[in-house]
Design a protein with these regions (language model features):
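C-terminal transmembrane module of polytopic alpha-helical membrane proteins
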Residues: 1-48, 230-293
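N-terminal TM1-TM2 helical hairpin plus the immediately adjacent luminal interfacial "cap"
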Residues: 52-190, 233-239
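Membrane-embedded alpha-helical segments of multi-pass membrane proteins
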Residues: 192-200, 242-246
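Alpha-helical transmembrane segments of multi-pass membrane proteins
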Residues: 60-67, 156, 202, 225-233, ...
Length: 293
């Protein structure tokens, strides 16, 4: 039956145990607000992650296809197969020191999360999201997961853009060249990885606060592996990863994942998604005269 259930029991989406529809948490697995204000039976039809992962993946794929079309179709080969032009990325809202500080397009810290530079880029990020996103939704709730995902992306791109703009200052430091290169942020940056690192940061915080060494250890291990991979591989924005992780950790601490998820959390999550969509539209509108040619 479609609608809100106000009495009785529902099935916890995380562990499958029966819980009261108005219980603050599942006493089997600890999930906050397992009844989802009575909408749990309806929301379960969207999957165990309540639609978060399919939504993000779908939106990212749509933006990737649009960026390919703006790039003129299939470009590159091998590891660079289906690469997207910098023109297309800028037109749809890429972030970095150039767009944010040189051009004043501050809203791109919201839109860049939904863009990817090539086929391997989006495949790797979406596989990571599939593994991490569902667990985050189960543990801290869908509303807070969306908030963390968006805010972490903003934090990551702000940090990377700021360090990208600080290149003249960083270059003056009396440090070896390889250290200086590690300190420099990005001039142009896109991708969901900053937000994904934010989810890992949130899980690390939850593990510490709840005393779950398993969640804390697994999330920290994921973060370390992905960060080291970013140091080894060229062209990866590690400062966005670091900023995203920190943003996710602090946002999780602010919203306290051990408490029941509230209606205003879902409202804030919707506002975050609307702001992200508006940021993409702002970049498109700014470049419309060029795009229409």
């Amino acid at each position: 039956m479609l609608g809100r259930k106000t009495t009785g029991s529902v099935v916890c989406a995380s562990c499958g145990s029966l819980v009261g529809v108005n219980d603050d948490k599942c006493y089997s697995c600890g999930r906050a607000n397992p009844g989802m204000w009575g909408f749990a039976p309806l929301l379960r039809q969207f999957g165990n992650d309540l639609g978060f992962v399919p939504f993000v993946m779908g939106a990212s794929v749509v933006m990737f296809v649009l960026s390919l079309l703006l790039s003129g179709g299939i470009q590159g080969g091998g590891l660079n197969l289906l690469s997207v032009s910098s023109y297309a990325l800028r037109a749809l809202g890429a972030s970095g020191a150039g767009p944010v500080f040189d051009e004043g397009h501050w809203w791109t810290v919201l839109s860049a999360t939904w863009l990817h530079a090539g086929l391997l880029h989006i495949l790797f990020n979406m596989m990571s999201l599939r593994n991490i996103g569902s667990d985050t939704v189960h543990i801290i709730g869908p509303g807070r997961t969306v908030i963390i995902y968006v805010v972490a992306g903003v934090c990551g791109f702000l940090l990377s853009s700021a360090l990208g703009a600080a290149v003249p200052i960083i270059a003056m430091l009396p440090l070896p060249i390889f250290i200086l290169r590690l300190l420099v942020g990005a001039q142009l940056t896109v991708g969901a990885s900053a937000s994904i690192f934010g989810l890992l940061g949130a899980l690390v915080h939850y593990g510490r606060k709840s005393g779950s060494s398993l969640i804390h250890g697994q999330a920290k291990q994921w973060a370390i592996i992905m960060f080291v991979y970013g140091l080894i591989m060229p062209g990866i924005d590690n400062w966005a990863h670091a900023g995203g992780f920190l943003g996710g950790y602090l946002t999780s601490a602010f919203f306290n994942p051990l408490t029941r998820e509230r209606g205003d959390h879902v409202l804030i999550a919707l506002l975050c998604l609307v702001a992200s969509f508006a940021a993409v539209l702002a970049s498109v509108a700014l470049n419309w005269s060029t795009l229409a040619m």
